Amino acid sequence: MVIDTHIRPALFSPICENKERFEKRCDQMNYHLMKPSSIELLKKQYALAGIEKVFLLPSDCSFETGEPDISNDEIEKIVQCDPTFFVGFASADPRKESAAEELEKAFKFQNLAGLYINTARLHMYPCDERLFVLYDICKKYKRPIIFQAGLSMENNSLAKYCRPIEFEEVLSKYPEVNICLSHVGWPWVQETAALLLKYENCYTNTALMNFDGPYQIYKKVFTEDMGALWVEHNIADKIMFGSGSPRIRPVRSKRGLDSLGFS
């Protein structure tokens, strides 16, 4: 089964009915010249890559923006369109006093599957004490965490807050929690590889598209930035497929990855 572990549903039509909110979301997340798409069309696009399940990642920086770019309620709404296909993740802005309560609600009542955090947007390091209450809730409910790692293309984001090595203490303190450092932590690819090798609970995904096309960037990252045999010999079971849609169509990501010929 092909699972896309990195979809940002900013353009999903069920949550784009309010034009002003849609435009604000696209501005915050740096999505431009894009239009909403129906669930039916999106699923046809996923089918071209053989994708049978997708992870939907929200965005909550509401402490500064006033409302989440993509809320937990909106994620829940999309999941309800096809619960066998969509897997919803939660987000909670740790700068808000209500963050822990919101995450508890997401896990206990909305049945969301994990937590997504973008520390680059939050302007805090992964070991900021305000985040630990959220990590504790993930541990309590046995839910994974997907972190933005490396460069974030979203507005008002600073990559220094999500350099892969900054996550090591969290990986060490929470061995029971599976943690994904997304985007292979690009451009700090070797730092990500080192953490994948050391920590059983550390994973990454292939959601990256920053230079060239998918054929070129994947070859550069997985056979040049890493040793040519690192993936096959050491960390193949730590790398999950993720397209990073809507910045790139999933079928392009999948074909680029397949071109490497990994078993």
Regions found by a protein language model. Give the residues of each.
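An N-terminally biased module of ancient metal coordination in phosphate/nucleic-acid-related enzymes
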Residues: 1-59, 64-66
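Hydrophobic faces of well-ordered beta-strands that scaffold small-molecule active sites
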Residues: 3-7, 54-56, 86-90, 113-117, ...
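Conserved, mostly hydrophobic/aromatic
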Residues: 6, 46, 75, 106, ...
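Distinct, well-ordered alpha-helical segments
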Residues: 66-69, 73, 98-107, 127-131, ...
